[in-house]
């Protein structure tokens, strides 16, 4: 976090230096944009440093050329009694242009052998500079595209985050409602259990048969279902007796016994059911 704040501070100083008195364009401050602008400021700082070094070198060479020009001028004056002041305006312009060209090309003299290699080197430097400039433009274009894509992605993520917060709030409200309902149901269940226990105690104090309690009735209901299931094979067995032909009187006796047994079971079940309904 400290490193990011330091980079943001350097970026702010660099932008203030670049725009001067003009207002700095608004941009969204985040880690991604800060990192991109920081790298641009570093490259700009390195470029400014290199330019300053070149300027200092050119100043030094200009001073050397001026000294050399003064020496040559003195030499000409001593050798052939020649002075630049004796030249015509055109000659003076040519001479100044020749000197300026020699200074610009950083050559030791104004001979053709010095001028041609210097011009070739300057042409090569020009092509290299143009190529480097194109590379920088392409890189800046990529950075701009990446920055735009990053900003769009960040916007989408912020919108998704807002939607997630809204959904989470709704789910939290639902969960709280369910918890409240659960607490209410628990309280009601406890209230019902207490009421049942109190009613059972009251009925017990009045001499009620324990077999008629809610728990016993539930058990009897289960037993009733079980007995009903048990009557199914008895009914099937009874139907098989109806098909017996060898001894009709004996079969009739068996049938009557089965009917009585079945009627007794159904009567018992009916009695239990009636007691449960009461």
UniProtKB/Swiss-Prot annotation:
It is found in: Cytoplasm; Cytoplasm, Cytoskeleton, Microtubule organizing center, Centrosome; Cytoplasm, Cytoskeleton, Spindle; Cytoplasm, Cytoskeleton, Spindle pole. Disulfide bonds: none annotated. InterPro entries: HAUS1. Residues 128-150, 248-278 form a coiled coil. Its main location: cytoplasm. Keywords: Cell cycle, Cell division, Coiled coil, Cytoplasm, Cytoskeleton, Microtubule, Mitosis. GO terms for cellular component: centrosome; cytosol; HAUS complex; mitotic spindle microtubule; spindle pole. One of its GO terms (biological process) is spindle assembly. Belongs to the HAUS1 family. Component of the HAUS augmin-like complex. The complex interacts with the gamma-tubulin ring complex and this interaction is required for spindle assembly. Associates with microtubules. The interaction with microtubules is strong during mitosis, while it is weak or absent during interphase. It is unclear whether this interaction is direct or indirect. Interacts with EML3 (phosphorylated form). Contributes to mitotic spindle assembly, maintenance of centrosome integrity and completion of cytokinesis as part of the HAUS augmin-like complex. PANTHER family: HAUS AUGMIN-LIKE COMPLEX SUBUNIT 1. This is HAUS augmin-like complex subunit 1. It comes from Rattus norvegicus. The lineage of its organism: Eukaryota, Metazoa, Chordata, Craniata, Vertebrata. The gene is Haus1.
């Amino acid at each position: 976090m400290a490193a990011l704040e330091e980079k943001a501070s350097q970026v702010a100083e660099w932008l203030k230096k670049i725009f001067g008195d003009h207002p700095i364009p608004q941009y969204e401050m985040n880690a991604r944009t800060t990192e991109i602008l920081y790298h641009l400021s570093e490259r700009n700082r390195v470029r400014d440093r290199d330019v300053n070094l070149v300027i200092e070198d050119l100043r030094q060479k200009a001073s050397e050329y001026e000294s050399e020009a003064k020496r040559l001028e003195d030499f000409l004056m001593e050798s052939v009694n020649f002075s630049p002041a004796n030249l015509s305006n055109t000659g003076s312009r040519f001479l100044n242009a020749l000197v300026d060209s020699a200074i610009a090309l950083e050559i030791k003299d104004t001979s053709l052998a010095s001028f041609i290699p210097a011009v070739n080197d300057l042409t090569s430097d020009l092509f290299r500079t143009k190529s480097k400039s194109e590379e920088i433009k392409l890189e800046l274009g990529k950075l701009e595209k990446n920055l735009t894509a990053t900003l769009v992605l960040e916007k989408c993520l912020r919108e998704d985050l807002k939607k997630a917060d809204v959904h989470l709030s709704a789910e939290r409200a639902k969960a709280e409602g369910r918890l409240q309902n659960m607490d209410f149901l628990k309280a009601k269940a406890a209230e019902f259990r207490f009421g049942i226990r109190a009613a059972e105690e009251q009925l017990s104090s009045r001499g009620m048969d324990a077999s008629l309690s809610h728990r016993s009735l539930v058990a009897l209901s289960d037993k009733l279902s079980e007995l009903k299931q048990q009557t199914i094979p008895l009914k099937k067995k009874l139907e098989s007796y109806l098909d017996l032909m060898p001894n009709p009187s004996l079969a009739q006796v068996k049938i009557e016994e089965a009917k009585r047994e079945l009627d007794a079971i159904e009567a018992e079940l009916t009695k239990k059911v009636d007691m449960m309904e009461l």
